[in-house]
Amino acid sequence: SFPTYSGDRHDFIREASTVLKYFAVQPNINIDIGVEVDSQGNAVMSGEDWKIDTTYSNYAKNVVVMGQIAYEVDADQMDKDSETYDMLWNGHGLVIYANIGDVDITPSRESLSYNERTKRFIHNRVESILTEIYTQVQDYVNECETLWKARKTLVNMQGNLMRVKTIREAVQEITTYNGVELFEQDVWNGVKLPERVEGSDAVVQYSKSKWRATIERNEIKTLKVVPSQHMTVILEDEKKGAISKIKHFLSESKEGTVYLIKGSNQYQESVLETLGASREEIVNV
């Protein structure tokens, strides 16, 4: 048994569940402390011997797991001009799985011993992981069924990973989908739209910030792809009152961007072709 102060109960449960999650055989506990056994299923990205798991965001530490024990990695022990330092200092949730003896630990067995051997292991693994991240994201993009899905996939991955400069630089090198350029070079995540066919043709951007009550409206020539949870693309059916539905949607969701493709059928088809999207991928209202 472990006596704790009542005020420390939640901290104790969180720390205990973090320690026990890497145990191959879970101990018998007479209270539910919410241990989620370690797996790759909850990872943003993963490889054979690493993963990035941001499930608990602010509490997700960078760790080396050796012998079923997770040792927190201290970024300040690494070269501050290195990609390793940037990834460890600015990122969270990195789990590196090590074999017994890959790293050294202190005599108390409570933390890593930051000798040259241990630091070299961590540095080499982070360098390898960055290469794998680039390869994986490019594979995810290339495996998409359509160009539009590829564009959204890359942008969504950027949202998950790009807080860390070294990861951001790796992901920014991905510019194509099976040889096709994903975005305009001079507009971040932008797709240049086709010229109008008729006077009523347009793509209109409706956007709302959670900090403002008003909804902004702008006709655009370049569509900027943003993470899927903040973006909806709609084909207008003039018989169904699309604009009132868009305003209601943005008011309910508190924030986001809606792109309304309006006008002639020829223009709508041209926009879909430019985006690389099928009608089934776009909302019709």
Model-derived regions: residue spans:
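Extended, well-ordered alpha-helical scaffold/bundle regions in very large, multi-domain proteins
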Residues: 115, 120, 136-138, 145
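GHKL/Histidine-kinase-like ATPase module
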Residues: 14, 24-131, 154-223, 244-245
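Alpha-helical scaffold elements adjacent to nucleotide-binding pockets in ATP/GTP-utilizing enzyme cores
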Residues: 15-19
